[in-house]
């Protein structure tokens, strides 16, 4: 093997290849116990727009003191994101949306606004009325376990922002094929990658 330490990782032999399933609504991949929002009205919590059993239009998520909302979605496993959709009424639907990938330090409005934005979206009333899936730059969201969503403005400058349904679209990395159990195993020792024989 090459002895220099600047070269990238080489895939081990007989490794199971990774494949990507077709993009879909990732509501089933959310860890609802770790999803939360700031500045939501008590009677209109985040669960109304993300929980699978509450996506019936009976309830909404609504901001409280002003138009801003800070939403954190945590996934059960790492996902590759490809789109975002928000369903909302014409008045009060989100218009300015900033996304932050894998930021554990996005704890409140001030700290989040100080962070670099992963992608910024401007939603039209047509986008939110129809819950259109707005494409994301997948190269910026290849392996996401936490997504922070900052909503700074809404349509018609309404006092509160209203969301009827929030969905992120993408897929989970899936391993297909099976590794040969008798093949040499891949390990690391002091930063130098090497093979070691599989045990009997």
Give the ranges of each region predicted by the language model.
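Extended, solvent-exposed segments with strong compositional bias
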Residues: 111-139
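Disordered, acidic Ser/Thr/Pro-rich linker "stalks" and the adjacent N-terminal cap
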Residues: 10, 14-74, 187-200
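Detector for Asparagine
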Residues: 14, 32, 39, 48, ...
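Aromatic, loop-rich ligand-recognition surfaces of beta-strand-rich domains
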Residues: 58-111, 138-200
């Amino acid at each position: 093997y090459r002895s220099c330490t600047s070269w990238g990782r080489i895939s081990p032999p007989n490794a199971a290849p990774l494949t990507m399933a077709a993009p879909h609504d990732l509501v089933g991949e959310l860890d609802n116990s770790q999803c939360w929002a700031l500045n939501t009205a008590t009677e209109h919590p985040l669960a109304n727009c993300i929980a699978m059993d509450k996506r019936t239009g009976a309830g909404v998520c609504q901001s409280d003191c002003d138009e801003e909302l800070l939403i954190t979605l945590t996934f059960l496993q790492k996902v590759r994101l490809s789109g975002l959709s928000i369903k909302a009424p014409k008045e009060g639907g989100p218009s300015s949306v900033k996304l932050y990938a894998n930021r554990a330090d996005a704890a409140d409005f001030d700290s989040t606004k100080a962070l670099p934005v992963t992608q910024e979206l401007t939603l039209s009333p047509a986008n939110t009325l129809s819950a259109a899936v707005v494409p994301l730059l997948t190269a910026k969201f290849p392996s996401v376990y936490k997504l922070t969503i900052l909503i700074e403005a809404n349509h018609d400058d309404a006092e509160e922002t209203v969301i009827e349904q929030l969905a992120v679209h993408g897929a989970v990395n899936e391993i297909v094929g099976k590794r040969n159990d008798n093949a040499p195993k891949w390990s690391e020792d002091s930063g130098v990658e090497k093979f070691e024989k599989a045990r009997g």
